[in-house]
């Protein structure tokens, strides 16, 4: 009994618990209708706690007060746990719909774009979506032409990789596309790298060393998902002079999704970059549109107008040039006669009657087809002049502007012309003078006119390009044209700069004809003989790099220019390269002919090298009968072979007369028989 009796100071607690458990359910104290305050009291019952009777009476009174409430509200007697209670309805401050969070669609969007945006925002969970339409850019980006770029922010690095991986799988499964995610790690690869990184961190913490948290390629924070072409459309015809930024021109719209983390997106700031480019492109288009609007003629009349208004007549100063180029001067519609062009009084020698003469189609091709331009007609007229009259009309220097009446009239017709028209007209005149044999044309003037056409984006006719290249690749000579020739370093710089521009314009110089001429020019000395600028190299050493370029670049074989190159190689002393090309002829489906053997023996006879000539006769004279078809001794071949035999051994005629059966003696007797036959005939 003593063990079951509670201590005296805790008797009230046991009685309170007993009375409470008998009167009310245990969980009644957990309801929200009653709140129990927390107080700090002493453990002595006489000071801090009321008597047992008062406590019991208070409890009973409280229960009696609660009884009527439970009877009035029967639902209150049923306890609802806190995790099952319904939250109080809080009015929504601002509800943003899905369409309001998605960016607006551009004009003419591809069919996949709305579904792609919804999938990126709703399923992948990317935030702050931004759509940039790069299709208006004339020069496409490195991603290609006609790009629509979507920029989104991921919540973490793991979310970044998972979103990009799911997007690629969705594009492949739903639309059969072939997306490429630049910077994406595979699922297993990312887990393995993260696991290894955590292991290194644990090992570093155990050993007490510092963990080098370097950039290991896991947390790049940027993945570019290129979906490729999502909608095909026909490729527009390219305008000549237009450029494609990177890669070939492909029709269709491509979509690129740029996924960033928040920090990386703020660092890269692609929105500012591309929006700035779009703004500049828009300003350029607006500038061209305003210029075209200002230059547009106020009124265009049909050619069959009978009574034109007096305001339609304009001053006949400088009409439009014959060169039709985009973004140039405005085109004027008129029906004026050719005789209506005004001309100065001191140019009476050029009367209008030559402008109405009948010209051949070839002359039309030289100067253009728009006969309404006085510049074109002046060039057309000068093509009909005899050579002597043309030389006097052009003077000593055709690049001069006032030395002759023709040059003054020619440059007067170009007053007010645009820079590209002016440069091309001067280039036309210089090329025309060179084609007629004028010797006063300088390379500098042709190069200046040519580069002016290139810098002004002028269209250079194909017929002028060979003439320009021929002028710039012509060696310099002294007073004697047949004397020594040289090609200076300044001439090389002029030629290379012009060739660079021609290659950029799409001209093909990867042919043996061009490289043969390069070899000839590179083998020339850099200055006149007797001056200090001689480099001390032999012609073969100067042109050796061109021969190596022909082999490395695998220049296509040309039978005619290959034989020309062989002549240059032999005369420059590069016998090994000559014999290499000589043996290559049959392998290139170009069998050796009688003319080839005539060239072979003529070059050896002119060389004066007896040892080299002796080897040539011993090796290749017996091969003539083995060629397909066989080559017999006749014509000029006999004379060249006799010269080689005399150079190889002066005693060959005497030994042949003695009846010696050596190869040289037999060949000499065969040559003598052929010469006797030709004399008899």
Curated annotation (Swiss-Prot):
Stretch list, region Disordered: 40-74, 284-320
Domain of life from the UniProt record: Eukaryota
Biased composition (Basic and acidic residues): 284-301
Any one Gene Ontology cellular component term annotated for this protein: mitochondrion
Comp. bias (Low complexity): 40-61
UniProt xrefs under Pfam families: RsfS
Transmembrane segments: none
Transit peptide location: 1-45
BP term (GO), one: mitochondrial gene expression
Purpose of the protein: Probable mitochondrial mRNA stabilization factor.
Family: Belongs to the ATP25 family.
Name recorded for this polypeptide: ATPase synthesis protein 25, mitochondrial
Taxonomic source organism: Emericella nidulans (strain FGSC A4 / ATCC 38163 / CBS 112.46 / NRRL 194 / M139)
């Amino acid at each position: 009994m003593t063990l079951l009796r509670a201590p005296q100071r805790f008797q009230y607690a046991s009685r309170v618990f007993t009375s409470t458990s008998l009167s009310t359910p245990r969980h009644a104290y957990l309801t929200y209708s009653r709140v129990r305050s927390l107080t700090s009291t002493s453990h002595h019952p006489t000071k801090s706690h009321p008597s047992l009777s008062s406590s019991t009476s208070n409890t009973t009174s409280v229960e009696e007060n609660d009884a009527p409430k439970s009877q009035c509200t029967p639902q209150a007697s049923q306890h609802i746990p806190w995790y099952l209670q319904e939250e109080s309805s809080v009015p929504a401050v601002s509800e943003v719909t899905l369409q309001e969070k998605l960016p607006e669609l551009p004009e003419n969007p591809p069919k996949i774009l709305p579904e792609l945006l919804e999938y990126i925002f709703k399923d992948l969970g990317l935030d702050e979506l931004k759509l940039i339409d790069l299709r208006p850019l004339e020069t496409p980006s490195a991603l290609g032409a006609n790009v629509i770029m979507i920029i989104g922010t991921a919540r973490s690095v793991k979310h970044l990789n998972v979103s990009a991986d799911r997007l690629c799988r969705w594009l492949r499964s739903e639309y059969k596309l072939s997306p490429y995610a630049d910077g994406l790690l595979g699922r297993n690869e990312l887990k393995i790298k993260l696991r290894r990184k955590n292991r290194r961190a644990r090992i570093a913490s155990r050993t007490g060393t510092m963990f080098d948290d370097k950039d290991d390629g896991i947390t790049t924070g940027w993945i570019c998902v290129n979906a490729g072409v999502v909608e095909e459309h026909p490729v527009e015809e390219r305008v000549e002079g237009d450029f494609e930024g990177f890669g070939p021109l492909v029709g269709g719209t491509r979509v690129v999704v740029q996924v960033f983390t928040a920090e990386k997106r703020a660092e890269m700031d692609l929105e500012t970059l591309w929006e700035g480019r779009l703004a500049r492109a828009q300003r350029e288009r607006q500038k061209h549109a305003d210029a075209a609007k200002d230059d547009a003629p106020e009124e265009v009349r049909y050619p069959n107008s009978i009574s034109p208004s007096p305001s339609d007549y304009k001053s006949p100063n400088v009409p439009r040039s014959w060169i039709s180029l985009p973004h140039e001067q405005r085109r004027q519609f008129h029906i004026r006669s050719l005789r209506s062009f005004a001309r100065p009084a001191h140019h009476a020698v050029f009367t209008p009657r030559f402008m109405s003469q009948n010209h051949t189609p070839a002359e039309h091709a030289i100067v253009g087809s728009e006969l309404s331009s006085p510049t074109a007609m002046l060039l057309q007229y000068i093509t009909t002049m005899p050579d002597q009259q043309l030389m006097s009309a052009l003077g000593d220097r055709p690049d001069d502007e006032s030395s002759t009446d023709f040059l003054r009239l020619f440059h007067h017709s170009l007053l007010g012309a645009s820079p590209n028209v002016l440069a091309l007209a001067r280039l036309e005149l210089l090329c025309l003078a060179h084609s007629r044999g004028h010797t006063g044309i300088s390379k500098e003037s042709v190069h200046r006119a040519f580069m002016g056409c290139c810098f002004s984006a002028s269209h250079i006719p194909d017929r002028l390009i060979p003439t320009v290249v021929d002028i710039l690749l012509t060696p310099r000579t002294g007073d004697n044209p047949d004397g020594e020739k040289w090609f200076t370093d300044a001439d090389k710089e002029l030629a290379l700069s012009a060739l660079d521009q021609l290659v950029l314009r799409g001209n093909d110089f990867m042919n043996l004809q061009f490289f043969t001429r390069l070899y000839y020019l590179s083998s020339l000395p850099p200055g006149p003989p007797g001056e200090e600028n001689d480099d001390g190299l032999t012609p073969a050493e100067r042109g050796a790099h061109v021969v190596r370029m022909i082999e490395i670049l695998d220049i296509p074989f040309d039978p005619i220019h290959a034989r020309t190159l062989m002549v240059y190689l032999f005369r420059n002393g590069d016998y090994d390269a000559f014999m290499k090309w000589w043996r290559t002829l049959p392998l290139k489906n170009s069998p050796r002919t009688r003319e080839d053997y005539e060239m072979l023996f003529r070059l050896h006879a002119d060389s004066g090298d007896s040892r080299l000539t002796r080897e040539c006769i011993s090796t290749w004279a017996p091969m003539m009968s083995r060629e397909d078809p066989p080559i017999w001794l006749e014509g000029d071949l006999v004379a060249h072979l006799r010269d080689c035999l005399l150079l190889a051994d002066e005693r060959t005629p005497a030994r042949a007369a003695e009846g010696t059966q050596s190869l040289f003696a037999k060949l000499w007797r065969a040559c003598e028989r052929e010469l006797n036959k030709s004399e008899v005939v």
